[in-house]
Amino acid sequence: MKKIAIDAMGGDNAPQAIIEGVNRALASFKDIEIQLYGDQEKIKHYLESEERVTIIHTDEKIDSDDEPAKAIRRKKNASMVLAAKAVKEGQADAVLSAGNTGALLAAGLFVVGRIKGVDRPGLMSTLPTTNQKGFDMLDLGANAENTASHLHQYAILGSFYAKNVRGIAKPRVGLLNNGTEETKGDPLRKETYALLSQDPNIHFIGNVEARDLMSGVADVVVADGFTGNAVLKSIEGTALSIMKQLKSSIKGGGFKAKLGALLLKESLSDMKHSLDYSGAGGAVLFGLKAPVVKSHGSSDANSIYYTIKQVRTMLETNVVGQLSEAFSKETISND
């Protein structure tokens, strides 16, 4: 039985969206147990059944405007902190939260802990592509500054995840740069390019540009945390803007526009699906001793369900255990 610790009070729509997502996951997956950390009365209001559910009551939670490191130290009984401690103490196998991103990163690093040999765990998410296959990108903001060695390690981590969780036999790894030529980029990108080119364990395809990411140019895209976070926000904003503009044009275009939308309903639905990243789950702080997964702060029940599904797959494939073993045996170089 896979035990997942969930911060029931984290996120804009907590606890309702969290618990409704849990209800659906419990109905779909009979091999999971859920530990819910938060206000017991509020949790029970939305919970359909307590079968395979344990509620750990706490009145304390970490707010979105709390300073991450201080919040982890001072709010020791916060729902997020208790969920992370459950993983550290072996009471749960993974932790999930839609709360304060910085605080979850801090809890992951300082409570759950890094895999030995991993210098900087990276925040990774599966983002949408027009071919609906998606691509994994890291770092998405766990670290503002990185070295070439860190980016090399992100390529290793991303490849490992793509193989073991997403089932891609030979993941194509691209380095995000301002051009595809080998000579492009600043010293960080050039040094990283050299490291990735020399690693036989990585299927490195070279530099990739931001404009090509959503066309599926690579299965894994490596970037420093600052750049990765900027690209993530750009992709999210672009997808939202496209859908908003389409709705506005249809509503304001009169009868012909509405008729056209009706005729193109299936195609528009496919396009919306291709731009929707919620079905891929949350962002993984990859490189820790257990799965620590961040769902979007505005997640609805559907997003929470898919994030639980993602965590279940990570546990089912034992991707963290395999990664830890690989690093401990030094079969993967992180020099």
UniProtKB/Swiss-Prot annotation:
Record-linked Gene3D superfamilies: Isopropylmalate Dehydrogenase
EC assignment: 2.3.1.274
Pfam family for this entry, one: FA_synthesis
Cellular component terms per the entry's GO annotation: cytoplasm
Main location: cytoplasm
Keywords of this entry: Cytoplasm, Lipid biosynthesis, Lipid metabolism, Phospholipid biosynthesis, Phospholipid metabolism, Transferase
Catalyses which reaction(s): a fatty acyl-[ACP] + phosphate = an acyl phosphate + holo-[ACP]
GO MF annotation: an example: phosphate:acyl-[acyl carrier protein] acyltransferase activity
SUPFAM superfamilies named among the record's database cross-references: Isocitrate/Isopropylmalate dehydrogenase-like
Biological or metabolic pathway of the protein: Lipid metabolism; phospholipid metabolism
InterPro entries for this protein: FA_synthesis, Phospholipid_synth_PlsX-like
Any one Gene Ontology BP term: fatty acid biosynthetic process
Entry's localization field: Cytoplasm
Record carries keyword Cytoplasm: yes
UniProt function note: Catalyzes the reversible formation of acyl-phosphate (acyl-PO(4)) from acyl-[acyl-carrier-protein] (acyl-ACP). This enzyme utilizes acyl-ACP as fatty acyl donor, but not acyl-CoA.
Family to which the UniProt record says this protein belongs: Belongs to the PlsX family.
UniProt-recorded name of the protein: Phosphate acyltransferase
Source species: Streptococcus uberis (strain ATCC BAA-854 / 0140J)
